[in-house]
Amino acid sequence: MKFHEFGDHHNPHIVLIHGGGNSWWNYLRQARLLSDKYHVILPVLDGHGEEYQHEYVSTEQSAKEFLEYIRKHCNGHVFAIGGVSLGGQIVMELLSLDSHIADKAIIDGSLCIPQPKLAKMSLFFVKCFGKLMFGRAACKMQLKLMRKMYPKMAYPEELERYYLE
């Protein structure tokens, strides 16, 4: 797992975790806006973005990695932690491991009630199509489509250059 950091490390820490099929750049605008007053940490989950070569293991494993990172680099506590979709699942798992790790938590688009059938089906699709859904090629396709479909929401050119090379 890789971490992109914005702002002064002495400011309160905010961790924003992207969803499946996305990467740290999902929160780039927010990080730039918040970095004047906060130390913003944008992780890249294994199997996503530039970490596509590392296999994503599980929500539980990712939460343990975040717990270790926060303990080591943020004195064991952050002001806020947020996640969307898969990122939100990881936030919930992280809070179950240490409910005092953050003052605030923002969870969007994540399942709060276990769905075993959905989990099995999701695992099947990720095993069969994971490289197509979450690899570098998928990132390139998303960036191209974003510019065409939602030009006002397109990512900065430096990100497009990085991923489209």
Q: Where on the chain are the PLM-derived regions?
A:
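Conserved HGGG/HGGXW glycine-rich cap/lid loop of the alpha/beta-hydrolase fold
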Residues: 5-52
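Structural signature of beta-strand start/N-cap positions in the alpha/beta core
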Residues: 13, 39, 78-80, 103-104
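Conserved catalytic-core motifs of eukaryotic protein kinase domains, centered on the activation segment
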Residues: 27-28, 51-57, 116-119
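Active-site signature of alpha/beta-hydrolase-fold catalytic machinery across serine-
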Residues: 29, 93-97
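Active-site loop/oxyanion-hole signature of alpha/beta-hydrolase fold enzymes
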Residues: 41-82
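Gly/Ala-rich beta-loop-alpha elbow adjacent to hydrolase catalytic centers
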Residues: 83-87, 91
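Flexible "cap/lid" loop of the alpha/beta hydrolase fold
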Residues: 96, 102-133
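Conserved alpha/beta-hydrolase catalytic His-Asp/Glu region
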Residues: 116-118, 135-165
